Amino acid sequence: MNSQSFKNFPSLKFISKKRRKERLLMVLLCLFIMAITTGLIVYAMRNTANFFRTPSEITKEDILTGRVLRLGGIVEKGTVEHNGEMQVTFFVIDHLKHEKVVFNGLLPDLFREGQSVIVEGYFDKQGLFIGKRVLAKHDETYMSKETADRLKKHHDIK
C-alpha cells in the first residue's frame, strides 16, 4: 500500500479520542443502570427489613396505614384465650403499654404466657393487631441488650 491509501483513514489520535468517549459513555451508562437497580431493590425491600417494635413504640401512623410490622414484647400472663379451633387472642406487653393480638393458626411450641414473643402482622381498621406469624423466643438472645434489659426490669422473663 502506498501513502495515498492512508489519507482516507481517520488519524489514530481521533480514533483514540472516539474510543475514550465511547468507554466513558459505557461506564456512565453502567453506573446509571446500577444506581437505578440499587434504588429499586431498596424500594422493594423497605417493608421486609423491619425489626420489631414494642407496644409503646407503635405510632398512630402504624395503626392507620395497615402496613406489615413486627410487634415484640412479652405475652401478658392470664390473657391467652383460645377462641374456636385455631383463633387465639392475647396481649403483648412492654413496660408502658400492651396491645391485643388476634392470631389464626398454630402457635409455636415455645409460646407461653410470660415469655418473649414477636408477632408479624398489621393493624386492622379497628386498631386491632392481626397476627400472621408468631415467633416465640426461648430467651432474650434474639433482642438487643437494651431491649432485654428494659423488659427484664419491668417483667419476669423466663
UniProtKB/Swiss-Prot annotation:
InterPro entries: CcmE, CcmE-like_sf, NA-bd_OB-fold
Residues passing through the membrane, by range: 24-44
Stretches in topological domain Periplasmic: 45-158
Subcellular localization, as worded in the UniProt entry: Cell inner membrane
MF terms in GO: heme binding; metal ion binding
Source domain of life: Bacteria
Entry's Gene Ontology cellular component terms: plasma membrane
Membrane topology: Single-pass type II membrane protein
Keywords associated with the record: Cell inner membrane, Cell membrane, Cytochrome c-type biogenesis, Heme, Iron, Membrane, Metal-binding, Signal-anchor, Transmembrane, Transmembrane helix
Keyword Heme: yes
Positions with a binding annotation for heme: 138, 142
Biological processes, Gene Ontology terms: cytochrome complex assembly
One Pfam family named in its UniProt record: CcmE
Family the UniProt entry places it in: Belongs to the CcmE/CycJ family.
Task of the protein: Heme chaperone required for the biogenesis of c-type cytochromes. Transiently binds heme delivered by CcmC and transfers the heme to apo-cytochromes in a process facilitated by CcmF and CcmH.
Protein name: Cytochrome c-type biogenesis protein CcmE
Source organism of the structure: Bartonella bacilliformis (strain ATCC 35685 / KC583 / Herrer 020/F12,63)
